[in-house]
Amino acid sequence: VGSEMCIRDSYLAAVERLLKEENCKNLGVEADEVLVNEYEQMKQLGVDICLLDEDIMNLRIVKDSEEIAAMRKTIAITDDIYSKVIQHIKVGMTEYEISALVQYYSTASGAQQMSFDTIVSSGERTALPHGRPTGRRVKAHEPIMIDFGIQYDNYQSDMTRVCFIGEPE
């Protein structure tokens, strides 16, 4: 209501226009970020295409104090989320419910989004490294694996932990 959508250029048309305006002879791209069909279309633009994945990786590997602080904060928030979740796990809860707790505390903690789909498995299912949560109800004394991560301040975390309700058998 009260707005109008205006599509001026496609992504590749905008790239082509910019290359011409700036009289560019080279275009640097990250292979991991460009679809094959986009790459094939870029080859038709009449410029040399340089793959910059390694160069960008080398630049990103060096962290300044602000980046290190942001990473530490993201990990601290992740630790706090896990601590809150395990305080609420009870015998009879489903893996789905535990996964929902992870999502809830992540959102409540200010996470921009989850880094990946949360994995919760229990009992013999903990042997499945990428098992998705199910309606299986957790039992006392059995392992519960929780694998999750958040995106906070544009930094990702990834935590995998195994816990028990009571002492392991």
Which positions does each model-derived feature cover?
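Short, small-residue-biased leader/transition segments that mark boundaries at the very start
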Residues: 2-7
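Flexible, acidic/His-enriched mid-domain "rim/lid" segments that flank
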Residues: 10-114, 168
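Short acidic loop-to-helix transition motifs that present clustered carboxylates
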Residues: 11, 124-127
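Acidic/histidine-enriched ion/cofactor-binding microenvironments in catalytic or ligand-binding pockets
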Residues: 20-23, 114, 126-155
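Conserved protein kinase catalytic core
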Residues: 36, 153, 164
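Basic, ligand-binding patches in group-transfer machinery
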Residues: 120
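Short, compositionally biased
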Residues: 157-169
